[in-house]
Amino acid sequence: MTTVRTRIAPSPTGDPHVGTAYIALFNLCFARQHGGQFILRIEDTDQLRSTRESEQQIYDALRWLGIEWDEGPDVGGPHGPYRQSERGHIYKRYSDELVEKGHAFTCFCTPERLDAVRAEQMARKETPRYDGHCMHLPKDEVQRRLAAGESHVTRMKVPTEGVCVVPDMLRGDVEIPWDRMDMQVLMKADGLPTYFLANVVDDHLMGITHVLRGEEWLPSAPKLIKLYEYFGWEQPQLCYMPLLRNPDKSKLSKRKNPTSITFYERMGYLPQALLNYLGRMGWSMPDEREKFTLAEMIEHFDLSRVSLGGPIFDLEKLSWLNGQWIREQSVEEFAREVQKWALNPEYLMKIAPHVQGRVENFSQIAPLAGFFFSGGVPLDASLFEHKKLDPTQVRQVLQLVLWKLESLRQWEKERITGCIQAVAEHLQLKLRDVMPLMFPAITGHASSVSVLDAMEILGADLSRYRLRQALELLGGASKKETKEWEKIRDAIPG
């Protein structure tokens, strides 16, 4: 009997996302319920955004939640390497095989030509797609241009008519027309694979039997199925999990909800409570109980109990469930958890240099630095009264700063400062005009330790969360203002 093997393959390009933990949890439970194995693979082929720091954060966040894996970059295994950036020679071999078999071709089209083709197609109200320009180039011309070192990619061929039947473990057979599929790039000009080739090759070579992934990948499933067919490989069983959603039913995003696992750890949520809550996202225990452990979820796990309705990630419900876990702890357990959270040595070492020179005794630390140890901060609208800006301008500045910070990939003091500076300059303000708004939003006080240092220490999600709170207190942005301010945001450099 074949051993069940599932996997999670996150990209190390930012803070570890609760959506990653959600999919990892369901893959883990499915594997364990069937006596199988769970694999962690790192998709780091985006060399511009991938970092080893983000990779380590993924390991730390998943382990904090209690999710462990049998094979992976940090624990090894018989199917390594487990980082895609270290498997380039493998992908090249299989990409070349597809070209030799006539299932893929070398494309020399420049980005400028591709942009022009797309623009023409959109002007004709056609779906933008590759036009097949290089698909039938003579072999000798291809070889000559390759020998000359001309930039190129490898594209797969796809049918232009008919439908592809995608067998989904949750939905049954899903029919997707082939004319919706583009000739997907498999190998990029930098010699690294795209998601499609790498996932198919890795899943096959690593013996993955079941792929549980987010439903956002369902529309592109025909490309994966066709690649399995081209290689002559047995396709793993596919399961497209419903996406986590905001309370307004939109896709879960950092613009409306904190999405970083690190945020919930910093806020003082118990890992077992967060994992419990993620387990309730579209799934329920046979007896419908709301509170359960990972071991209990594994014992009773059944994919047939997954609901296709988009599960709502509601911060209030998570907080309620976390409270249930807290109240069931013994006093000793509670005290231990509080100590571990509040007196984290690594976190205290980040804060200490900014507090030490401002206090004369330890009792002054809490009033000065208490905001480092809370989720939200107490806000008073009077703190946002500004000598130079009217209330609408205050809201505009806070909204624009929030939007710019939401697009920030690396959360460092210099980059945070750059975002705020860019907003100020575009609005013809000075940095000193904007900073008095940042202090109360982030610290709850008109003055405190350096607010820029504080934002770096607090982290992206918690800082953005507090800015959202401040905006809500001041009335937020109307639909008309949002449209107007978005145009301003898009014109701000950086």
Curated annotation (Swiss-Prot):
List, in alphabetical order, the Gene Ontology terms for molecular function in this entry: ATP binding; glutamate-tRNA ligase activity; tRNA binding; zinc ion binding
Q: Which SUPFAM superfamilies match?
A: An anticodon-binding domain of class I aminoacyl-tRNA synthetases (SSF48163), Nucleotidylyl transferase (SSF52374)
Question: Where is the protein found, in the record's own terms?
Answer: Cytoplasm
Q: Which cofactor does it need?
A: Zn(2+)
Which organism does this sequence originate in?
Pseudomonas aeruginosa (strain UCBPP-PA14)
Which chemical reaction does it catalyze? tRNA(Glu) + L-glutamate + ATP = L-glutamyl-tRNA(Glu) + AMP + diphosphate
Describe its function: Catalyzes the attachment of glutamate to tRNA(Glu) in a two-step reaction: glutamate is first activated by ATP to form Glu-AMP and then transferred to the acceptor end of tRNA(Glu).
InterPro entries, A to Z: aa-tRNA-synth_I_cd-bd, aa-tRNA-synth_I_codon-bd_sub2, aa-tRNA-synth_I_CS, aa_tRNA-synth_I_cd-bd_sf, Glu-tRNA-ligase_bac/mito, Glu/Gln-tRNA-synth, Glu/Gln-tRNA-synth_Ib_cat-dom, GluQ/Sye
What Enzyme Commission number(s) does the record list for this chain? Answer: 6.1.1.17
Q: How is the cofactor bound?
A: Binds 1 zinc ion per subunit.
This chain belongs to which protein, by name? Answer: Glutamate--tRNA ligase
